[in-house]
């Protein structure tokens, strides 16, 4: 029949209902146990009664007892089902300590009297509730015996409170005579009366000016002892502290119904679960954070690879710069595959380097190590030069290093030995030399040992193949800039052609150039296969000259022209660019969303505005991304 112990801060009612239920049936001893569990009621039975030999709640108009009860209820009292009575009293005393000075000094007389009213009513009602005959109210008779000085009448209940707790502390026991089961029973009743808080005040009960039929002796004797106690109490105060302060440290959370042992138990910081309280969590921030950080990482990282992946999907398969090229189709003989032997680190001869394009039949003159590197990348016959990264006019011919960012262009001696006919030897070269990324060819294009010219996928693909993936972002812009600078001068034939077409077409040069060069877009996608001249030609039939000039697929053109058209660069860029931009946008999204969510949280301000803006932003972002 344990009533749940009540938490200090919580108003006692709910629990007490249960106690009310039981208290009628309690055996004397049980009653005592019960009292031990709830400090309040037991606080009633205190040495004061031993003095009077009678039970406060019944004798002295219940005020005293009620007084004792109520404040204790209001101030938290420790609910621990104190198996050790000592401890329990300790706690009570602790709270009392807070109460005493206050109530003694500040509580006005009226308040005390008021209490007396209320408490009397309560007691009476409780006794009726209990219905046990012994408890029927001893009607307080105005006994002339009892004329305490009014101030004493006021002060007494309050003082009694303090002193009771003191007494209990000193005695070290529950301070009610174990011998009087009846008393303990009644005190229980009193407690329950307080718990079932009837709002009714019976007018019948007189204010406490007189004590109910009890001898005056107890109260007369009482004040002396009380005052002593009060005096000592101030000195003793430090002693009241509960024996192990740790138990006091965690106050139970406000609404909690758990047993104190739960909230008092030492807690590892990890066990504490996040609370809804505004205070910062007990749990360490590191514990929450790493996941967040990791998540964001996951967000950001894939985006980088995805960038390159998407672009290969365009039908070319440039490998990330450092990576050795993947082996072409399984069906292809592997040996031919390393057509670019390690020696040709610049895998794809840039068109600008004049490399003799070997027809399939030719044995490829493999550059001797002494050969300067730029010429060195001898285009394998199978590969039209177009795919090779065409050095844009501004660029030195060393694009190959760009191609293989990690690898210095160094010519392994074995390289020169390789002949197109010797399939095995190329393979060996490859193994002997650095593992070169093999020329980036679309996987579909087998590099046959003979290296017959393999029809490459359409020019744009080839071009993008040879594009070094790495520096892509800044390079094209630089190149375009260089190209534009060249345009007026017509330094390179290709540039001249471009200038010619732009002027011939009647497009203002300005419009054309921005279109080609807009860093974001690159040349319009329509132009994918063609050099500037070709674009122009396609767009206006009148531009025949430019068309004739540059209409051959730019690959061929670049072969002849010393300066390869920059366009392919730009072009691959253009096709690359729209999605690349969107990827950037997406990549930024998580970062933006971090602060954004914070704003969302913080801006309790104009909700409409915020939401509208937010919604708009979201729409835009989504639309642009995809």
Swiss-Prot record:
Disorder association: GNAS hyperfunction: This condition is characterized by increased trauma-related bleeding tendency, prolonged bleeding time, brachydactyly and intellectual disability. Both the XLas isoforms and the ALEX protein are mutated which strongly reduces the interaction between them and this may allow unimpeded activation of the XLas isoforms. ACTH-independent macronodular adrenal hyperplasia 1: A rare adrenal defect characterized by multiple, bilateral, non-pigmented, benign, adrenocortical nodules. It results in excessive production of cortisol leading to ACTH-independent Cushing syndrome. Clinical manifestations of Cushing syndrome include facial and truncal obesity, abdominal striae, muscular weakness, osteoporosis, arterial hypertension, diabetes.
Organism phylogeny: Eukaryota, Metazoa, Chordata, Craniata, Vertebrata
UniProt protein name: Protein ALEX
Comp. bias intervals (Basic and acidic residues): 281-312
Record localization: Cell membrane; Cell projection, Ruffle
GO annotation terms (biological process): adenylate cyclase-activating G protein-coupled receptor signaling pathway; bone development; cognition; developmental growth; hair follicle placode formation; platelet aggregation; positive regulation of cold-induced thermogenesis; regulation of signal transduction
Extra remark beyond the main annotation: This protein is produced by a bicistronic gene which also produces guanine nucleotide-binding protein G(s) subunit alpha from an overlapping reading frame.
GO annotations of cellular component type: cytosol; membrane; plasma membrane; ruffle
Composition bias, Polar residues: 186-195, 255-270, 600-611
GN (gene name): GNAS
């Amino acid at each position: 029949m344990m009533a749940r112990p009540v938490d200090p801060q919580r108003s006692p009612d709910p629990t007490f209902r249960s106690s009310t239920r039981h208290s009628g049936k309690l055996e004397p001893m049980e009653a005592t146990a019960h009292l031990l569990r709830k400090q309040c009621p037991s606080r009633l039975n205190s040495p004061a009664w031993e003095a009077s030999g009678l039970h406060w709640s019944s004798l002295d108009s219940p005020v005293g007892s009620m007084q004792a009860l109520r404040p204790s209820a209001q101030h938290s009292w420790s609910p621990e089902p104190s198996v050790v009575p000592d401890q329990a009293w300790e706690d009570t005393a602790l709270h009392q300590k807070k109460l005493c000075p206050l109530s003694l000094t500040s509580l006005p007389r009226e308040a005390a009297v008021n209490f007396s009213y209320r408490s009397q009513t309560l007691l009476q009602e409780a006794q009726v509730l209990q219905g046990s005959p012994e408890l029927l109210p001893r009607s307080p008779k105005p006994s002339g015996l009892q004329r305490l000085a009014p101030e004493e009448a006021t002060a007494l209940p309050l003082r009694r409170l303090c002193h009771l707790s003191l007494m209990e502390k000193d005695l070290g026991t529950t301070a009610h005579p174990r011998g009087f089961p009846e008393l303990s029973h009644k005190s229980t009743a009193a407690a329950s009366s307080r718990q079932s808080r009837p709002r009714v005040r019976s007018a019948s009960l007189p204010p406490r000016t007189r004590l109910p039929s009890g001898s005056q002796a107890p109260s007369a004797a009482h004040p002396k002892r009380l005052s002593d106690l009060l005096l000592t109490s101030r000195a003793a105060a430090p002693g009241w502290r509960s024996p192990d302060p740790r138990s006091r440290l965690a106050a139970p959370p406000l609404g909690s119904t758990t047993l104190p042992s739960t909230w008092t138990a030492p807690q590892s910081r990890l066990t504490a679960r996040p609370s809804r309280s505004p205070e910062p969590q007990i749990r360490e921030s590191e514990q929450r954070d790493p996941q967040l950080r990791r998540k964001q990482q996951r967000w950001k990282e894939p985006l980088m690879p995805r960038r390159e992946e998407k672009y290969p999907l365009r039908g070319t398969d440039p490998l990330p710069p450092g990576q050795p090229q993947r082996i072409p189709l399984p069906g292809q003989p592997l040996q031919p595959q390393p057509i670019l032997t390690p020696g040709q680190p610049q895998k794809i001869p840039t068109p600008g380097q004049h490399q003799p394009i070997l027809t399939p039949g030719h044995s490829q003159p493999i550059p001797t190590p002494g050969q300067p590197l730029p010429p060195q990348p001898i285009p394998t016959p199978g590969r039209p030069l177009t795919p090779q990264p065409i050095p844009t006019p501004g660029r030195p011919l060393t694009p190959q290093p760009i191609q293989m960012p990690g690898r210095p262009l160094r010519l392994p001696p074995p390289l020169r030995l390789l002949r197109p006919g010797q399939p095995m030897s190329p393979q060996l070269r490859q193994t002997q030399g650095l593992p070169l990324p093999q020329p980036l060819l679309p996987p579909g294009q087998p590099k046959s040992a003979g290296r017959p010219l393999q029809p490459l996928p359409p020019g744009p693909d080839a071009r993008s193949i040879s594009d070094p993936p790495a520096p892509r972002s800044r390079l094209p812009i630089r190149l375009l800039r260089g190209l534009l600078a060249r345009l007026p001068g017509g330094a390179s034939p290709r540039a001249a052609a471009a200038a010619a077409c732009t002027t011939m077409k009647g497009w203002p040069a300005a419009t054309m150039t921005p279109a080609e060069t807009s860093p974001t877009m690159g040349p319009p996608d329509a132009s994918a296969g063609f050099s500037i001249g070709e674009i122009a030609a396609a767009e206006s039939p009148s531009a025949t000259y430019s068309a004739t000039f540059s209409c051959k697929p730019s690959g061929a053109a670049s072969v002849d022209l010393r300066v390869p058209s920059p366009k392919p660069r730009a072009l691959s860029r253009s096709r690359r660019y729209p999605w690349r931009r969107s990827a950037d946008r997406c990549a930024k999204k998580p970062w933006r969303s971090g602060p954004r969510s914070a704003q969302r949280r913080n801006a309790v301000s104009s909700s409409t505005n915020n939401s509208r803006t937010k919604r708009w932003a979201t729409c835009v972002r989504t639309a642009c991304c995809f």
